[in-house]
UniProtKB/Swiss-Prot annotation:
Basic and acidic residues compositional bias, start-end: 1-19
InterPro entries: Cytosolic_Fe-S_CAF, Fe_hydrogenase, Fe_hydrogenase_lsu_C, Fe_hydrogenase_ssu
Assembly notes: Interacts with LMNA and binds to the farnesylated C-terminal domain.
GO cellular component: lamin filament; nuclear lamina; nuclear lumen; nucleolus; nucleoplasm
Family from the record: Belongs to the NARF family.
Localization of this protein: Nucleus
GO molecular-function terms, A-Z: lamin binding
Keywords: Nucleus, Phosphoprotein
Tissue expression per record: Ubiquitous. Predominantly expressed in skeletal muscle, heart and brain.
Protein name: Nuclear prelamin A recognition factor
UniProt keyword annotation of Thylakoid present: no
């Protein structure tokens, strides 16, 4: 992605040299952890990544930079080793939550089926000293269900006076950070308030699971395994609601690639193990996913729900139509010859920028957009889908897409466990506690209007 018209004179990346763009494996730079790496683009006389602009000094505090550098395997092993050395009263309960988009990577990496890859990963982590391994799909259930309700509400309230649409997804931390730090209130007002799956998983582990185990949140060290580096930054910003003790939902985020490096250096002959669930001794034998080609599936599930709730239309197959490119696609619902729902998927910052420009000009006809920072979606996260020299690994991505497509799809509404948790944990589907735990607010910190003049 090229940015040839940036006017950010204060950007510290202008003095950056090519040598400074290299980073160590232990401390990935914020520049490598945000958005598309793609091609270099020019800012004055310096070569920088587009992602540098999105995580420059104006966006990241010194404290965040230090904390981000600690989000690595060393921190994970620090806790594992402390558990082996210190008194049992000081032990941490280690919980690892794995994103479903990471599993195709492990399946491709070790030439296994996705189910066997899940069991191999779980068995390996437990051989290191991890106590519980969870799948974050249940957290995505909550995120999608809350997003469905919010979209229907916004659609019904939308008018010329109260422009609540389009609703833009908020599950991608790279996109959300860009919206908050660069685009500001005109765009953050359109962000869905439902928390991301990672944020919901933090509450599930540190609140619900902790109480089930009679543990304080501080006794749990929660690790997220995710396909992209932006999740590390999300972990720094996410705190549980004050009523839930105010601790961080995720203590450490490791990318799929970082976990694979640990596995390659360890003993892979360990016994496989089934993934744990939040419900006692019950194990998760089957790997399932939501209906998205390479994402958590917000678009498809919200589209079906809205079609039924608003127009009493049952949609079984969601049909995508490519518009500008394969990363900008459209889904529509027609009734009596009129388009009544128009959804889009916008992946990658080039498509995001085009979307924003049209939205600000009032020429954006969509009711809902699934927005992801990475071209190709979550499977193409730079924490797993890249070559050793830092470029996108297209062959690996195609392989992962095939594996992911073969995973059985489940609808969030069909999960009895989710309905149980709404009642047992959140005191009802539309309760004040559900609102507090499952929704968030956004902080607009615009740095200047010139940001929208950038051409990608």
């Amino acid at each position: 992605m090229k940015c040839e018209h940036c006017t950010r004179k204060e950007c510290s990346k202008k003095t950056k040299t090519d040598d400074q763009e290299n980073v160590s494996a232990d401390a990935p730079s914020p520049a490598q952890e945000n958005g598309e790496k793609g091609e270099f683009h020019k800012l004055a006389d310096a070569k920088i990544f587009l992602s540098d602009c999105l995580a420059c000094d104006s966006c990241m505090t010194a404290e965040e930079g230090v904390q981000l550098s600690q989000q690595n395997a060393k921190d994970f092993f620090r806790v594992l080793n402390l558990n082996k050395k210190c008194d049992t009263s000081k032990h941490k309960v280690l919980v690892v939550s794995v994103c479903p988009q990471s599993l195709p990577y492990f399946a491709a990496k070790f030439n296994l089926s996705v189910t066997d890859a899940s069991r191999r990963l779980c068995g390996f982590l437990k051989s290191l000293g991890v106590h519980y391994v969870f799948d974050t799909t249940i957290a995505a259930d909550f995120s999608i269900l809350e997003s469905q309700k919010e979209f229907v509400r916004r659609y019904r309230q939308h008018s010329e006076e109260e422009r609540t649409l389009p609703m833009l997804t908020s599950a991608c931390p790279g996109w959300v950070r860009y919206a908050e730090r660069v685009l500001g209130r005109p765009i953050t007002a359109h962000l869905c308030t439902a928390k991301s799956p990672q944020q919901v998983m933090g509450s599930l582990v540190k609140d619900y699971f902790a109480r089930q185990q009679n543990l304080s949140p501080e006794k749990i060290f929660h690790v997220i395994v995710a396909p992209c580096y932006d999740k590390k930054l999300e972990a720094l910003q996410e705190s549980l609601p004050p009523a839930l003790h105010g601790s961080r939902g995720a203590d450490c985020v490791l990318t799929s690639g970082e976990i694979a490096q640990i596995m390659e250096q360890g003993d892979l002959s360990v016994r496989d193990a089934a993934v744990d669930t939040l419900f006692g001794d019950l194990k998760e034998d089957k790997v399932t996913r939501h209906d998205g080609a390479s994402s958590d599936g917000h678009l498809a599930h919200i589209f079906r729900h809205a079609a039924k709730e608003l127009f009493n239309e049952d949609v079984e197959e969601v049909t995508y139509r490519a518009l500008r490119n394969k990363d900008f696609q459209e889904v529509t619902l027609e009734k009596n010859g009129e388009v009544v729902l128009r959804f889009a998927a916008a992946y990658g910052f080039r498509n995001i920028q085009n979307m924003i420009l049209k939205l600000k000009k009032g020429k954006f006809p969509f009711h809902f957009v699934e927005v992801l920072a990475c071209a190709g979606g979550c499977l193409n996260g730079r924490g797993q889908a890249q070559t050793p020299d830092g470029h996108a690994d297209k062959a690996l991505l195609r392989q992962m897409e095939g594996i992911y497509a073969d995973i059985p799809v489940r609808r969030p509404e069909s999960s009895a466990h989710v309905q149980e948790l709404y009642q047992e944990w959140l005191e009802g589907i539309n309760s004040p506690k559900a609102r507090e735990v499952l929704h968030t607010t956004y902080q607009s910190q615009e740095r200047g209007t010139h940001s929208l003049d950038i051409k990608w």
